[in-house]
Each structure stands twice: as structure tokens, then as C-alpha cells.
């Protein structure tokens, strides 16, 4: 970490209380850490101002409504630590979406010009041995893409991707690619199997789902491993524009791009792109190739159970491929497929009779050559 620090700390002690009036700013902040970004992160300006109060007798520390500024984006910060536990809250109101790009430093935002705001509040608390409580709430307010930089995605475009083996993948998404499937030709039960499994709020959110973010971070804290919590739109952003590394800034870039994509493209076009660029098995891109790879049939012939299976492997096309290689699916996995089908039935995307017929069906892969 490097940068130029300026400011003051005034300390006042009264009995067992120690209060510190703090106003610290850092210009030209440089941070190198693999969890932050794959390259050194540079922030033009950071400022923290507020009062921190410590009670030596009670062994407590708190700061309320302190002010923070990150590159011109302002918010408030509160925190408390005592013998009952620890908590903090960050509140950022009405940040212009056009300002967010200044924090991420990436060529994929060339030509980025956006209108609208975002409100965001992050809270965390943990008392004793209880599970930590984490929440992310917010709202994207009237997002509007001013530039036309993503309009090319409304037409057939060339998809370029580097797979997990660092091999380039390139194909046209649209007419000119015989494997391309227009959304209207994907059965509703396949479409909704993926939506309820990957992003149930797809048609309601504006690219990002704050509730799912909270659930993902809570899982990450509890299980001490990464779970993305990405919407379908975020997954599109990641596949179209970003590197594969897992860093905080890559996730932040993904969020900004998802908001931009949602404001630029129709939900129908987003789904059409998604179904045609997703990797469903090692080296198997697009729903058409996936249908032939797993079941030896065209997309329109897929059953609800087969659609549920395709939805279930999206999070791990390499990790879950052993089932196809073994030629069978475990009972536990079948239970998961039935859960997806049940959600589809309860949400009106599968009739009760279709649900009953589907849970009776045996999942059969195509014979391997």
C-alpha cells in the first residue's frame, strides 16, 4: 500500500472514555493484493472523517455516522465493538451510475456514459457465538444508457472467450451460426428451468439482485468459500467482457456492466444471448450443442426433466461432467432436479400433470460413442 497521507487525529480523554476526532485523506492510493485485483489498484482519493469513542472500562469502541469518500463517491460509516459482539454499516445514497466507472479502471468501460443513480446499504453484525447477520439492500434508480457502445449486442456479434484451459473460443451469436437457437425456439419448460435455478428474479431486477447478494456473502462467510450470487445478466457480463480471476474489483465491474446491459438490451435478448454462450459441459457452448451432447436430440425435443438437468450443471460444467461420463445421475442429484420441477409447478411454469409425469421420468443420457 502506498499514497500520500494528510489530516489530523485529535484525542481527548475523560475518565475511562477516549474520543478521537479523525479526518484523514489519502491521495494517489495504490494497493497491490490478489483479492483486490489482478493488477495494482489505484484510487485518486480516499477520505475518512468522524469521531471514534473508546470506553476502556467496558472495552468498547464505536463510531457513528462517520463520513467516507472513495474517489468522489461519498457515504456514511458506523461501527461498534463491545463484549456482546461487533457490527458495522455502510450507507451510500444516490451515487450517479456514471461515477462508478471511475473506481474500476478497466478498458471494457471505454465509451461508458450512463444516467441514473444507485442507493446501497451494507450491514454486518455478529453477537457471541451466533451466526453473523449480513445484508445488502439497495435500488438502481432510473438507469439509462446514453452511449451506444453496447448496441452491437442487439444484432449478431462475434463472441470471444478464453476457456479455463486458456484456449480461445470464438463463434457468432446469431444468424450465420447453425448452432444458434433463437429464444422463441427454446421450450418454455427449458427456459424456466434455467431461470428458477439461476435467477428467479430475472424479470424483476435491473441487472443485479441485492437479496441474492446478501445470501451469497452470508454463504461465503459461513462456509469460507466463494459463491458468486450472480444474476443471469451478471453472468453474461462476466462471459462477454471480463477475465476469469476471482477478485473484488472483477465482481464490482461485473455489477456495473450488468446494470448497463439490463438498461441497453431487452430481457428477451439477454436470455437469447445467455442460452447461446453458456458453457454446459467442457467445451460445449450453447443450448443446441448441450442438447445434442447430453441427450442426442434437438432443443425442441427436450423434456422438463432434461431441461432441469441442463439448468443444474450451469454452475459447474467441468465439475459436474462426471455424471455424464458415468452414464448416470445420483439419487441426490435427481432430488435436486425434482426440486427445480416443483418450483416450476408452484410458480405456474409447469402444470401439475406435467410435474407428476416429469418426476416419474427416468433421466437417460445419449449413448457415448
Set out the residue ranges of the language-model regions.
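Juxtamembrane regions of bacterial inner-membrane/periplasmic proteins
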Residues: 1-2, 11-19, 26-369
